[in-house]
Amino acid sequence: MIAQIRGKLILKTVSMVIIDNHGIGYEVMIPLSTYYELPDVGSEVSLFVYTFFKQDSILLVGFCTENEKQLFKLMISVSGIGPRLAVNVLSGINSSELIHAIANNDLNRLLKVPGLGRKMAQRVILELRDKVSGWTSKEQITFINNKKDAIDQSVMEEDAISALINLGYKSQAAKDAIDRVISEGGENKSLDVILKKALKVLAM
């Protein structure tokens, strides 16, 4: 089982990366929180990896921190939640909010995460509430810091909208959120910053 990958980052998107390790390119699914922490393409990168075996393939899911990997493992322990939905959840809400929502029975906050219906959100709280009670989120979860340069504005806006749609938000809702962020001073900001602000808007 692959638990960690270290190598050259040869491709990155908001949902996956390809890492070259000794001439072999590994495609790794990632949540947005990991995307925010990635270095530039061509740089060395190391990710903690969860290996998911399917009938005809292997799915690798990568994280910048071991703590986030453990949170991912908690999510997929919930009946009905697979790796893709778990990644989607970790992309739609930061680790601190997720732990707080589960520990405090905040169903309304979980319902704002795309892909989590009422029954699934209730199941997450029911099955994980006791398990996260010992987590001190501010101390144990590594948070994201924006370190990326701004990119072309129009391309950035399109990429941001596309990323939100891929997370499960409706096209118009994604566009409205991005437009609001831009109108409130988001011009010339990096994709990372725009996405984080847009997710906060969508969570309101």
Curated annotation (Swiss-Prot):
Residues 1-64 are annotated as: Domain I. The keyword DNA damage applies. Gene3D superfamilies: 5' to 3' exonuclease, C-terminal subdomain (1.10.150.20), DNA helicase RuvA subunit, C-terminal domain (1.10.8.10), Nucleic acid-binding proteins (2.40.50.140). The keyword DNA repair applies. One of its GO terms (biological process) is DNA recombination. It comes from the Bacteria. It is found in: Cytoplasm. GO terms for cellular component: cytoplasm; Holliday junction helicase complex; Holliday junction resolvase complex. Keywords: Cytoplasm, DNA damage, DNA recombination, DNA repair, DNA-binding. Its main location: cytoplasm. Pfam families: HHH_5 (PF14520), RuvA_C (PF07499), RuvA_N (PF01330). Residues 154-204 are annotated as: Domain III. Residues 144-154 are annotated as: Flexible linker. Residues 65-143 are annotated as: Domain II. InterPro entries: DNA_helicase_Holl-junc_RuvA_I (IPR013849), Hlx-hairpin-Hlx_DNA-bd_motif (IPR003583), NA-bd_OB-fold (IPR012340), RuvA (IPR000085), RuvA_2-like (IPR010994), RuvA_C (IPR011114), RuvA_C_sf (IPR036267). GO terms for molecular function: ATP binding; four-way junction DNA binding; four-way junction helicase activity. Belongs to the RuvA family. HAMAP family: DNA_HJ_migration_RuvA (MF_00031). Has three domains with a flexible linker between the domains II and III and assumes an 'L' shape. Domain III is highly mobile and contacts RuvB. The RuvA-RuvB-RuvC complex processes Holliday junction (HJ) DNA during genetic recombination and DNA repair, while the RuvA-RuvB complex plays an important role in the rescue of blocked DNA replication forks via replication fork reversal (RFR). RuvA specifically binds to HJ cruciform DNA, conferring on it an open structure. The RuvB hexamer acts as an ATP-dependent pump, pulling dsDNA into and through the RuvAB complex. HJ branch migration allows RuvC to scan DNA until it finds its consensus sequence, where it cleaves and resolves the cruciform DNA. Homotetramer. Forms an RuvA(8)-RuvB(12)-Holliday junction (HJ) complex. HJ DNA is sandwiched between 2 RuvA tetramers; dsDNA enters through RuvA and exits via RuvB. An RuvB hexamer assembles on each DNA strand where it exits the tetramer. Each RuvB hexamer is contacted by two RuvA subunits (via domain III) on 2 adjacent RuvB subunits; this complex drives branch migration. In the full resolvosome a probable DNA-RuvA(4)-RuvB(12)-RuvC(2) complex forms which resolves the HJ. This is Holliday junction branch migration complex subunit RuvA. The gene is ruvA.
